[in-house]
């Protein structure tokens, strides 16, 4: 389970559900909603992994140049380190490594970032199963359940969002966890042992 774009008021709700089911997740956080930063601390204390999305999540900013990307990444890294005492080394690119948006701002930047993040000691994670909750802010909970439980891989990296509008994601989460648990899956946070999920890079 991975959650992008938090923290928000929904993050604590997600954490309660994870705790109830003894499930762990990874939160790719931003700096856009810092009044909920205590949720980052709680998530980490609960045994989840805190990872970096970007500080602004503004495509025009982060994908304008490699320098702009790493300046933004440093900001979110510093913020998380201030909260948890740790500088995360796991990241997720806004839109994923296969995003079709970055080329509007800097042609070829994703290929450059692909190698540069590794040179700087980071690892990035995409996903191989999507909840579809990014399609709009009003995706019905049942649609999210259906999308999320439609994957049968041995190792699943499932994409959710825990930003403010994603209330139906929270609503859908218990049924998704129950479905996978009934099929014998275990929910782990990303660690150095986690299989790496990369999309094909688009530029």
What spans do the regions from the language model cover?
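Short aromatic-enriched loop/helix-cap "lid" or pocket-rim segments at secondary-structure transitions
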Residues: 39-40, 102-106, 171, 198-202
